[in-house]
Amino acid sequence: MSDINATRLPAWLTDCPCVGDDVNRLLTRGESLC
């Protein structure tokens, strides 16, 4: 799952402005806070 999340990371940053400093935790958990 980490690979998929890493690939969608830029998409999350664009679609989910709510994630900023939590990006690292997002990749670690593999879950979207949005």
Swiss-Prot record:
**Example of a GO MF term:** toxin activity
Proregion residues excised on maturation: 1-10, 18-34
Q: In which tissues is it expressed?
A: Expressed in basidiocarps.
InterPro entries named in the record: Amanitin/phalloidin (IPR027582)
Q: Where is this cross-link: Cyclopeptide (Ala-Pro)?
A: 11-17
Posttranslational modification: Processed by the macrocyclase-peptidase enzyme POPB to yield a toxic cyclic heptapeptide. POPB first removes 10 residues from the N-terminus. Conformational trapping of the remaining peptide forces the enzyme to release this intermediate rather than proceed to macrocyclization. The enzyme rebinds the remaining peptide in a different conformation and catalyzes macrocyclization of the N-terminal 7 residues.
Print the keywords alphabetically.
Toxin
Top-rank lineage group of the source organism: Eukaryota
State what this protein does.
Answer: Probable toxin that belongs to the MSDIN-like toxin family responsible for a large number of food poisoning cases and deaths.
Family designation: Belongs to the MSDIN fungal toxin family.
Protein name in the entry: MSDIN-like toxin proprotein 7
